[in-house]
Regions:
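Active-site-proximal helices and loops of the catalytic beta/alpha 8
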Residues: 1-4, 54-57, 65-168, 185
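Active-site rim elements
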Residues: 39-42, 72-77, 178-187
Length: 187
């Protein structure tokens, strides 16, 4: 139908055994790490990037000041350098609106987050500090304010090594997690 170039479609044997895919028949599959209903974009495709540019421009022209990018860790696969793509998209949006703000959701370890900060992106959510068992709430409950401050400062220093302008996005919880109020209500 002419849309195959937009997605990560390959011979099924191309994918690693732990990669989630959607079988397309005739020996082909489409990468779908997040959900069987959500195929992965081919982020190396010129057509895909043209569409991303049009979509960003559409929303920026209507007054949107920034973007929250869901599941950034899936921007990287066998043939896609997630940092390169993120840099391209960030620079593209900055070309449309100089002061656009971009925050990435990246449920992964510090080294992956640090790598994506090399793209220049403004912020990434600091998941290790969130949830009822994360650093912030745990230390609020135990009254460990100084320990929390030191952990956040060390994290911030580590991330700004990759991007001196990084604004780490600390938060307590989001729509994918148990709400922070549940952890604090008994305190």
């Amino acid at each position: 139908d002419g849309n195959a170039e937009y997605f990560e479609i390959h011979k099924a044997s191309y994918f690693d055994s732990d990669t989630q895919t959607i079988s397309l028949g005739n020996g082909y599959a489409c990468e779908a790490n997040f959900s069987q209903e959500m195929p992965e974009w081919n982020l190396n495709s010129k057509k895909t990037r043209e569409e991303f540019t049009k979509i960003a421009k559409f929303w920026i022209d209507r007054g949107v000041d920034g973007f929250r990018l869901d599941a950034c860790k899936y921007f990287t696969n066998k043939e896609t350098d997630g940092t390169e793509f993120l840099k391209w998209f960030y620079d593209t949006c900055k070309g449309i609106k100089e002061d656009v703000y971009m925050v990435g959701e990246n449920w992964t370890d510090d080294s992956d987050i640090q790598e994506l900060y090399k793209s220049g992106i403004d912020s990434q959510f600091a998941f290790k500090f969130s949830t009822s068992t994360g650093t912030i709430i745990s230390n609020i409950i135990s009254q460990g304010g100084m320990a929390t401050a030191k952990k956040i400062m060390n994290y911030d220093n580590k991330m700004t090594e990759s991007n001196p302008n990084a604004i780490n996005a600390m938060f307590l919880s989001n729509h994918d997690q148990v709400r922070s109020g549940n952890a604090l209500e008994s305190q």
